[in-house]
């Protein structure tokens, strides 16, 4: 440290000397309100053919009122990352982001003001927002955040996902959190909700997607939410075990290996290993004072199953065993005396078995519905889901690659999904099949494209992404051109 000090003094002296010879100019290099640094953009809201707003890194807000020919910098008065934006009309809208940030604009994105809310107090990130009208909006985010305003954002009502005593995750909570649940206090579910969308009035349908394959649909603008179901074609009959036997028979090993091979490359699919014991085994080995003999049997059968799956190519981190033996059950008994009894009851079946099934838990980024019935979802690993019944059930469609697809939308009979490293897929049959876009329909893009949207007439649309990139279409997505940054200007470079 002593040796480096003269260097710092020299640098300071040089700075003073230069300042004495040349007047330093700290004035902006571009007019106020114009874009100087092209930050990463994470979301865009397209109001009509003329008006759109995009938001992103370090509080970046860009707005246009001439169809995207010129973009201007809005005054967000924050350095927080902004993950989503939704405009109710040409003047009013919201943006949400880091640590519960909610911003409101009443002048088309030119200026914004912060709206206090409970998620800001909790420090929970907000990932998605949808403006139903100038007074009503939903926002979603981490820790199951789901909040609603009906007064323009003056107040926000908490409708977040919480854990109850009968919730599957209750037993995995810390003891203090379990006690909070018993006392009726809120303990939020550890899941991120990434996107929310609603159809325009008079429809009252809305949808939410997020981590772990979470999909919700509502028929009453979010008054009630119901879970959607992802349908899969990979199933397997249970592995049966004779009394007090832990080895899997050769025929069952073959079936299990064949099951694993079907999903080996579908890394968004995990495997549930669910053990059950017969009434006889429970009576002989499941003593309340000493359950460890039964625990040993269950654990050995689980380990056998895991071993076969691993040999067939399923990594251990894709296996889920929520009902494995609770070896630390005594830690729970003082607060929950019936804990072990309920575990035994939940593991009892007519015959000892291991049920192996697929857990549909893809990481989902964006949901889009063109009408009340037909919808699309994009996600991590090239996931595309399609629904024909308003979001009640979903099926996988093949995108052809495993790169992330961050956003999906449809216009004029053409569905488009965009993602990382310039990954684009197009469908002209309502999302049933996907292929590369035609040559020359997109400019060369090698960075991420984070969001896309169209105006209501489905002609003008924008894609936003890394280094302030904005692509525009004027023909419903057939042809896209770059409008930002101008020329070769990119992130961190000044005009």
Regions found by a protein language model. Give the residues of each.
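Residue-level hotspots at or immediately adjacent to binding/recognition sites across diverse folds
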Residues: 21-236, 254, 265, 280, ...
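Periplasmic OmpA/Pal-like peptidoglycan-binding modules at the C-termini of bacterial envelope proteins
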Residues: 265-269, 281-288, 300-362, 369
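Bacterial N-terminal signal peptides
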Residues: 11-19
